[in-house]
């Protein structure tokens, strides 16, 4: 499970037990490089063969974070010949948090995540961000639970058109 929408990357191993996703391992070393964090969770070739799929959060959220996590997920899925599933980050994370929260989208804006959906707001009016501590254990399971069927290509979700593209 990989998701970079929050501005820090969630890296976790999730198993299904009695029909429910359970986070069995999660790397909380957010200041470490992403590939190092991934290999910390699955260090040996034997452990890698126990993986059955790769799930990635597709945003909306941190522009760079979503793209980095998606790139890593595609590489892992291709390298290990595993199915790739995508999960709408805002919807899954709202289910995990059970409250409104915001995701920083640079220095001026945030993505306000509400039960009814997500919208871009000025950063100064945004609600509290979902913290790293709040996300532990629950975010990965929520993303896994909300994942769709296997896909050949990831479709990243953006909250608004890119700046300057309005007239095109």
Q: Where are the model-predicted features located?
A:
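Oxyanion-binding and handling regions
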Residues: 1-36, 85-168
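Long, contiguous secondary-structure blocks with strong helical propensity
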Residues: 2-8, 15-16, 52-55, 72-77
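Short, low-complexity, polar/charged sequence segments that are solvent-exposed and flexible
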Residues: 18-21, 42-44, 73-76, 120-121
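Generic alpha-helical scaffold signal
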Residues: 28, 32-35, 48, 66-70
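Buried hydrophobic packing segments
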Residues: 38, 72-77, 142-144
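Phosphate/pyrophosphate-binding loops at sites that engage ATP/ADP/AMP, CoA/4′-phosphopantetheine
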Residues: 38-53
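DPxDG-like acidic metal-binding loop motif
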Residues: 53-58, 63-83
């Amino acid at each position: 499970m990989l998701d970079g929408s929050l501005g820090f990357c969630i890296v976790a191993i999730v198993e299904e037990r009695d029909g429910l996703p359970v986070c069995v391992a999660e790397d909380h070393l957010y200041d470490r490089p992403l590939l190092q964090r991934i290999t910390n969770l699955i260090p040996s070739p034997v452990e890698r063969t126990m993986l059955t799929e790769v799930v990635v959060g597709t945003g909306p959220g941190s522009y760079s974070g979503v793209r980095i996590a998606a790139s890593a997920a595609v590489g892992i899925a291709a390298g290990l010949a595993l199915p790739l599933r995508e999960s709408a980050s805002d919807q899954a994370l709202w289910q995990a948090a059970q409250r409104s929260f915001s995701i920083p989208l640079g220095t001026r804006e945030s993505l306000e995540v509400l039960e009814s959906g997500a919208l871009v707001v000025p950063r100064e009016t945004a609600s509290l961000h979902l913290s790293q501590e709040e996300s532990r254990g629950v975010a990965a399971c929520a993303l896994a639970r909300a994942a769709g069927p296997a896909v050949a290509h990831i479709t990243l979700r953006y909250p608004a058109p890119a700046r300057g593209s309005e007239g095109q």
